[in-house]
Regions:
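Early extracytoplasmic/lumenal segment of secretory-pathway proteins
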Residues: 1-46, 172
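Ligand-binding pocket segment of bilobal, Venus flytrap-like solute-binding proteins
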Residues: 120-124, 128-132, 139-181
Length: 181
């Protein structure tokens, strides 16, 4: 950031948030002064629908045309009028191989009572529900109320096993040994 600030003659203020919902609450509460926010795709759609974001100037984004095909024309903003993909990836299970002797091959390990108090889950309801639904053999995008209730019940069973719900610094929890999954 220092080099960017020097080169462009600006001062960058970084304000982090631990979840999409926290960002949305800040914006709905009247927080201003943001030039850039980094929500997930579903939250970008909500922010666009609620008029919480300004239109982008395409002349300042020359590399937007070089995005990979699967990142072009996203459903929530197909013409990149309000949003440009910043990153894309997947969620998996990180683990301490000195404690978890068998490489996890399913989400089921996150319900193993041997790891009570040593499990960290992302503080992101979509990711967590998605993982639970996948562990049940269901689509992570299901709208079936019965499956969603079943996922909720599984999360309530898991809750006593979880040390932290963290979307920031989860890597540090694992590296320090505070959690093993």
């Amino acid at each position: 950031l220092t080099e960017f600030e020097r080169r462009h003659g600006v001062r960058v203020v970084v304000d982090t948030f631990s979840s999409n919902e926290e960002l949305l609450a800040k914006l709905q509460g009247g927080a201003t002064g943001y030039d850039v926010t980094v929500p997930s795709d579903f939250m970008a759609a909500i922010m666009i629908q609620q008029g919480l974001v300004a239109e982008l100037d395409p002349t300042t984004l020359p590399n937007a045309t070089t995005l990979e095909d699967h990142l072009q024309h996203l459903p929530f903003d197909p013409t990149h009028r309000y949003a440009i993909p910043y990153l894309w990836g997947t969620v998996g299970i990180g683990y301490d191989s000195a404690v978890v002797s068998t490489t996890p091959d399913s989400w089921a390990v996150l319900w193993d009572p041997r790891y009570t108090g040593k499990i960290s889950m992302l503080n992101d309801q979509r990711e967590v529900f998605g993982a639970v639904l996948r562990s049940m053999g269901a689509s992570m995008n299901t709208k079936d109320p019965g499956l969603i209730e079943a996922a909720k019940a599984r999360l309530l069973v898991q809750k006593p096993l979880v040390k932290a719900y963290a979307s920031e610094h989860y890597d540090q929890l694992l590296a320090s040994g505070d959690v093993v999954l």
